[in-house]
Amino acid sequence: RQCDWSSDVCSSDLDVAVMPEAIERLAKWTGSHDVIQGSRYDYDGGPFYWQYDFIVPLGIPNPIAPAAFGRPGYRVMDTLCFEGGLFRRNIVEQIGLPDPRFFIYWDDTMYGYRASKVTNPIVVPDVILRRTREIGNWDIAGVRQLNSTSDMNRYHIMRNRGYMARYFMSFGDYRPLMFGFGTLLTAAKEVIRLVMVDREHAKTGLVQIAKGWWDSRKLLHDPDWKPMPPLK
């Protein structure tokens, strides 16, 4: 879902509920920042850690980025989550719309990456969302958790790295060896997810991981691919 008012656009998703004070909580940041990511509560009411730091050369989120917001009260980020993202309309005009070819997964990450080329997106501690459904997960030492996902997601997690690489190429950020290592790490993470959280889908999940990885190579070498154009 999307809603817009004045010169700002906000985005949300279907498995989160917007807090009544969400707009007011984000409004105080709009005077000095063009892209703002609010925080959220997990399904159980506890804080939800979101990986705001994207390691561009590897093409993976940083799982150990500090959760504290520090003296400024916010963290600069180079990614985005469509659940609770707020961005000024002139940013959309400069970078274009989100790329629908991703279908699912990495689309919001890459939209935040594109936005970071024209402004400094931030994530703030103000809670504006609450998750509305419980997701099976593996708790990692009480610090991070690895959530359950579907085979369709597994396929697109791997396939869409082809699109990701193309955007990195268009901005001069593509490093083949490091990105390839990031793809290997991504595949390893998905295999671990299968073993620890989604074991009943191990056979079909491995097939989708391999298929998505194979198809990403086709996208990487597609001669007709072009990035999403700016709106103005």
Show where each model-derived region lies:
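A recurrent flexible, glycine/aromatic-enriched loop bordering the glycosyltransferase active site
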Residues: 2-3, 67-87, 145
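Active-site donor/metal-binding and catalytic loop motifs
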Residues: 124-145
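Non-catalytic, C-terminal membrane-associated alpha-helical segments of glycosyltransferases
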Residues: 169-232
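Conserved donor NDP-sugar-binding/catalytic core segment of glycosyltransferases
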Residues: 17-53
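Single conserved hydrophobic/aromatic residue that forms the stacking wall/gate
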Residues: 1-9
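Acidic metal-phosphate-binding loop of nucleotide-sugar-dependent transferases
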Residues: 15-17, 102
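Short, flexible, basic/aromatic active-site loop/helix in glycosyltransferases
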Residues: 39, 55-78
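A short, conserved alpha-helix in the catalytic core of glycosyltransferases
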Residues: 85, 91-96, 101-127
